[in-house]
């Protein structure tokens, strides 16, 4: 193969050979991240929770996605893990490493989100948010980062939220956990900066996903929400967030670490 052909192949499949674990990937942003990675040459392990998908009316979504991914990347797999269970984060990374032969890129997309008035917040709600949105990530990072550092290359991208800097009054605990998570990402970005490992957060604003499908039941109300959400007066789509994730995971993102990058149509302005 000529050098020019090799360069062209790299441009078309910049993630060829990369082994990627994506949490919360059966729907929405995580789903599009998985699709784009496979389209650009990676092998992926998608994490999902069968129980949660069934509870929210999306039973079988992960199986459909895995089938689609395997058409391009036969070694790609789906991993059903409840991140609410103790030590599940480390177990997930271990299973992904066994399936893929290692994890080069970790995309933390899974989260729980409960809307509630501040006065109605319970200890159970706080514990659930903390467990899924923070503790599980600590476990995953403890398992994933040492091999990345030893290899001299790795990428961690966390899906944050506009709420971590502009919190919704009904998402107080969720927003606090997202802010804490980015603080963790910044801390570890500094620790591993000399190891060839970068860690960043991508913070979406209003994105049209299954999580907010209930808002689109009344299209007039939805369009009003879009107009007020950001200076672009529209919701983003999962692909727009996923594209930023892939940039950060690529060699082109090698000099970016510890950043919180908004993908929000200018809502942070």
Describe the role of every protein-language-model region:
Residues 193, 198, 256-258:
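Short, small/polar-rich loop/turn modules that mediate ligand/substrate recognition or access, typified
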Residues 100, 234-263, 268:
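C-terminal substrate-recognition "lid" of short-chain dehydrogenase/reductases
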Residues 117-130, 222, 226:
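Substrate-binding pocket helix/loop in short-chain dehydrogenase/reductase
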């Amino acid at each position: 193969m000529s050098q020019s052909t090799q360069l062209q192949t790299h441009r078309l499949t910049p993630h060829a050979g990369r082994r990627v674990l994506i949490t919360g990937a059966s729907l929405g942003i995580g789903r599009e991240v998985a699709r784009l990675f496979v389209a650009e040459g990676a092998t992926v392990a998608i994490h999902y929770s069968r129980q949660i998908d069934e509870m929210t009316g999306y039973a079988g979504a992960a199986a459909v996605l895995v089938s689609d991914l395997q058409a391009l990347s036969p070694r790609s797999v789906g991993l059903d893990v409840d991140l609410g269970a103790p030590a599940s984060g480390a177990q997930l990374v271990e299973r992904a490493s066994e399936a893929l032969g290692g994890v080069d890129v970790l995309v933390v997309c899974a989260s729980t989100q409960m809307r509630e008035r501040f006065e109605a917040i319970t200890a159970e709600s706080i514990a659930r948010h903390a467990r899924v949105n923070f503790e599980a990530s600590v476990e995953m990072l403890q398992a994933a980062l040492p091999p990345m550092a030893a290899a001299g290359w790795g990428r961690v991208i966390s899906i944050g939220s506009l709420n971590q800097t502009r919190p919704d009054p009904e998402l107080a605990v969720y927003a606090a956990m997202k802010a804490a998570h980015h603080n963790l990402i910044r801390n570890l970005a500094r620790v591993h900066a000399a190891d060839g490992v970068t860690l960043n957060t991508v913070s979406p604003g209003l994105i049209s996903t299954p999580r907010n499908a209930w808002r689109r039941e009344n299209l007039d109300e939805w369009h009003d929400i879009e107009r007020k959400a950001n200076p672009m007066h529209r919701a983003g789509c999962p692909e727009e967030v996923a594209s930023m994730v892939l940039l950060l995971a690529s060699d082109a993102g090698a000099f970016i670490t510890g950043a919180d990058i908004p993908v929000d149509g200018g809502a942070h302005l």
